[in-house]
Each structure stands twice: as structure tokens, then as C-alpha cells.
Regions:
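Non-transmembrane, aqueous-exposed alpha-helical and coiled segments at domain scale
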Residues: 1-201
């Protein structure tokens, strides 16, 4: 509310912006910049098209889905420290019986990364420190549990043998919420960072 940040909060937000800045030309919004630029269109039109792509729940909107899914989990699981209860919820999630009934554990899986998303690994180390500072270690522990169990359950149910890992979206929304950034600003913050990459392309 007073618009001031602790040194750790500033470092975490800075890291978030850096991690979202660029990620190759294969992601949806960066690919969109290639397509629109190839027609000879101007920079403003290219950025507008990239923003439209980023808005989708499978791209820039994924952080919001993770946060909403975790809220739903807390609402529907009596004891979030009970791994059996969390596992049962995640199974119901994949069976399209919970949350938005899409059969997805949001923030899990990536088109390229199977062992780990290096951006998520960097983010996770800062997330723990911030959670400790903000008195949200319990929430961080729940995210850890969902990460661990989610990998197992997806691999078992979907027969994914190459492995599955959390992506950068998994912890991003949690970090933004600890920084008191509203959900409505999650995707615009992503865009602020990613415009650097779009411009480079």
C-alpha cells in the first residue's frame, strides 16, 4: 500500500522480470511477432498481436490459473498438510472433476523442458526466501507438495516417460501475490518483461 519494497522484494521482482524477458522464438507470443513482422507490418501492430497471444490462459494467463487452482485446492482439501488428501485432489483434477474441469494441473509441464525448467528452479530459490519473510512458509510447503505429487501423478496417469516438471508459471503467481500485486496485473507484468524479447525478434 505504501509503494515501498524491501530489498528482497525488489530483488525478487527484478528476477521475475529478467526470467520472463525472453525465452526463444518458439513460444506463442514470440512466434506471433515473427509471423506479423514477416508481413512487413509496423512495430506497434507486432506488439499488439503479441499481446493478444500472451493473453491466452495457456501462455501469459497461466499464472492466474495456477493461483486460482491453488485457491480451489485449499477450499476443497480439509488438511493441506495431508499428502493423501492433496494427492486425491490432484487425481480428481486430472480426471476433470475439480476446479475448471479441464483435466490440467496448471504450472506443470512444458513443450521443451521435461527434467526441469531452469527459470522455475531460479524462481523457486527466491520464492522460499520471500515466503519466509512474508510468513507464508505454509503456502510454500503446499506448492512444494503439489510440485512433487503433481509430477508423479501426471507421469502415472498420462504415461509420460520423459518426465514432467513445473514451469516458470507455477511459482510466478504465488510470488506476485506475496508482493501484493493483484491478479489483474500478472499478465501485464509478463508483457512488460517480454516486450524486450519481442523487440529483439
Amino acid at each position: 500500500p505504501d509503494k515501498s519494497y524491501t530489498p528482497l522484494e525488489a530483488l525478487v521482482l527484478d528476477t521475475a522480470l529478467i526470467l520472463h524477458m525472453e525465452h526463444g522464438g518458439g513460444n506463442n507470443s514470440s512466434f506471433t511477432t515473427h509471423v506479423v513482422t514477416s508481413s512487413g507490418s509496423d512495430t506497434y501492430s507486432v506488439m499488439a498481436a503479441a499481446l493478444c497471444s500472451l493473453k491466452g490462459p495457456k501462455h501469459g494467463g497461466a499464472k492466474i490459473k495456477v493461483v486460482r487452482m491453488m485457491e480451489d485446492l485449499k477450499k476443497n482439501v480439509r488438511d493441506t498438510s495431508d499428502e493423501d488428501e492433496v494427492r486425491a485432489y490432484l487425481n480428481r483434477l486430472l480426471n476433470k472433476e475439480e476446479f475448471d474441469k479441464k483435466g490440467l494441473i496448471y504450472g506443470m509441464g512444458h513443450a521443451v523442458y521435461s527434467v526441469s525448467d531452469p527459470r522455475a528452479e531460479v524462481f523457486k530459490s527466491f520464492t522460499k526466501e520471500l515466503a519466509d519473510e512474508k510468513g507464508r512458509s505454509g503456502d510454500f510447503a503446499l506448492y512444494n507438495t503439489v510440485e512433487r505429487l503433481g509430477k508423479e501423478i501426471i507421469s502415472e496417469k498420462r504415461k509420460i516417460y520423459k518426465g514432467v516438471s513445473v514451469n516458470v508459471d507455477f511459482y510466478s503467481g504465488f510470488v506476485y501475490s506475496m508482493l501484493d500485486i493483484t491478479v489483474e496485473l500478472f499478465t501485464p507484468i509478463f508483457a512488460i518483461a517480454r516486450i524486450t524479447g519481442w523487440s529483439a525478434h
